[in-house]
């Protein structure tokens, strides 16, 4: 929209006529509902465009909550009890990091991330996240890596971890010591963590393909249909990682309504603001809405509701839209008096709104991500959304509760130490019953853990909530209850007997091995061929017709080669995962299939085949994450070595074997003869199934 057109919109030439239109829409909403109003508005927009009007499309909405107060689902929980539990978890999460950094060596750790997201996790644990049980397959939660201390603190109150365990945060090399890793690592805690989410960006892309694979298993009849969800927690700064947003169109295109992203928008990353000169929530709303996601903005807490209700002229909403994130951060860092002057003071109307509020009242105007009632309403809406994935953009304060030690400060992410005065302020703010004499000093024991006792109302409430939801989380299944038969070496006789005078590549030999497995009635349903738009290069096009390409909505067109034997066949129950030109997508699908034995109690046998030069070199971090979570499957680096010399320097692959060798639980082979590929296949299946 050009400046002249924008000015025309902003300066209404006929407010009375505009009011009549607004009243008409209000009448439609009252009589026939919002869907009918939306239909009428879309028709009006279409007519205007057909008449030549230029109406730019906007994927963003006002800087207010998506769910109005009157439509919020009400939480069934005991709000006072849940606040008390949340305070205890906050204290112990802080204590374990501060204690770790009062030891020699300053072990590191993070306080501020969980401090900002405690309510987001608490509501999920208390009301939404189901553990695997006889009645339900369980939800999959991808926890934000830097929030791990808060997850450990909850497990401590539940009795799953001891004070000794907490005191060994980041201490994992001492003999006989359990130790707690700094981030979610299934390799280090195989019965606890499920998905490694650090390095940043790994959680979101894995969550998308885990959700896709759950739908895949259901479509192929391998598991019963259910309402299980994949929840992924990530930070707003983390969204700059290509893996964070690079696959969100997959989720929108495949209508993955079993997927929920919760983005903790505390407006800060490691060094400073995420978008100090802009608005990260608006930016992310546009990106996700454009990719076909249901976007729920959770910006303001309940204390803002009366002010917004009085904003009949829209001046407060206008101010909210104008204010950039750097200013919002300053408001929380400098307090109520600063906010009165520099935020509300920009317009006479907004200044008048808070004239009767004290500076303390203004400081207490809360953000949506810290309001359990608003969080519950957002989660409730997310789990009841059909036909599309949901992202919740929750605005929070980084370092919430840390005060001068880090609350809304640029140094919050690096804050690992809190001195005596800051610890006392934290204790008082969250009403922890620890006397002054126990927190005087700067030694280790001056920041004690607090547990109210296993029979306390708080612990009993926590355990009752988790019992109703199937059990404690995090929890990881280490071994599937199902077993698959392992074929003998004779199954691969067509490969082991050789090809006579005719030479074939080892890539072709491997593909033949896959085809032999697809003819085995017991193993075939569990084989998952995964390609990234190179099936024809590797001689796999025969699988298109034989087992079909997975397409959630089926094939809605007649393929160009439909009259040929090996035509391009897509089907709702197709077996091949065709991930397009995306090695990161292909390996994430492979990870989902290779962890199915643990996540879904359904062992599978995935084969991800790719140009060797674009494997470990390009997606090494995801492959390392695969090793971390004990993926079972085959990675096939095809057309390797000198095969690509003619393609240019970037394609020359002489290092993949070297890189593969540094992943400890990746058994790397470079076969020369066909019979070697048969042995590798048979022995690999024996090892993994």
What function would you assign to each model-found segment?
Residues 160-172, 252-264, 286-293, 624-641:
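A glycine-rich helix N-cap at a beta->alpha junction
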Residues 265-497:
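Long, well-ordered, tryptophan-enriched scaffold segments
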Residues 71-72, 77-89, 93-103, 110-254, ...:
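Cofactor-binding active-site loop characterized by glycine-rich and histidine/acidic residues
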Residues 488, 628-689:
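Active-site phosphate/pyrophosphate-binding segments
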Residues 72-93, 114, 129-132, 139-140, ...:
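Non-catalytic terminal/interface segments that mediate subunit docking, oligomerization
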Residues 145-149, 231-241, 264-269, 301-304, ...:
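Acidic, glycine-rich active-site loops and adjacent beta-strand->loop/helix elements
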Residues 2-158, 162, 426, 503-520, ...:
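N-terminal amphipathic, basic-rich helices that act as targeting or association modules
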Residues 152-156, 181, 218, 222, ...:
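Short acidic, glycine/serine/threonine-rich loops at helix termini
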